[in-house]
Amino acid sequence: KTSQQVMRRIVDVRWRKRLGPVQIAGRLGVPASTVHAVLTRCRINRLSYIDRVTGEPLRRYEHDYPGSLIHVDVTKFANIPDGGGHRFLSREHGRRNRQRTAHRTGERAGNWRPRIGIAFLHTVIDDHSRMAYAEIQSDEKAVTAIGVLRRAVAWFAERGVTVERVLSDNGSAYVSYAWRDACAELNITPKRTRPYRPQTNGKIERFHRTLGDGWAYARFYESTDQRNTALPGWLHFYNHHRAHGALGWSTPAATLTTLRDNVPVEHI
């Protein structure tokens, strides 16, 4: 039987160095099979199970039914200059497009460099079903975030979902009295993540990566307007056609079903 001292050393190296069983075995002079058995017993046999910040095993959770908790956040994307940006073109071509766009809009920074601006994407996702709602806005002020929340709550209500709680980070909009009052008016309990622990809101952070790969950076856009126009179609694909591993390879929309005939609420 493996001693407690050896087990602690194995776990310590796993947390600090994020090494595999063979590498840990080489460092500590124990069989790789023993290392693997210890990692499995401690539920850290996969690196994806370990929090990158704390080194502790991830504590995953899912609320029991739609609306029990929604996650909200804001992610930002640089606007696209007329003709496209440097991500798909050369840097020089992208720079010329920025110059032309700034000349048309008159938007320049204090040092006269072209300023294209930022799109603030307000996102809302249901914890249980992963059903997603999003709006592109020009800022992340409290009044804007509250407007998005109201419309998202109404959107979910149209699909038979009553929102009970909302989880956000500690951004200025979400810690404001206005946000608290709006939640009270909507009969929603506001909750916030622990400071410096964005992984607490990990579901929506993961959604942002999916959204970036599937929509924002998926193809060449000639302008910000063209990218914005593509968002509703991508959201429909995400909600209705993209299988989700955490949902047993079902879709978010299929998870939101009525008790009658097992028909998705979205299509009634």
What are these regions (language model features)?
Residues R59, G67-S68, L186-I188, R209-I268:
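C-terminal domain-tail junction helix/linker
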Residues Q99-L121, E135-G160:
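Active-site beta-loop-alpha junctions of metal-dependent nucleic acid enzymes
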Residues E140, E158-S176, R194-Y196, W249-A253:
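Acidic/histidine-rich, metal-coordinating catalytic segments
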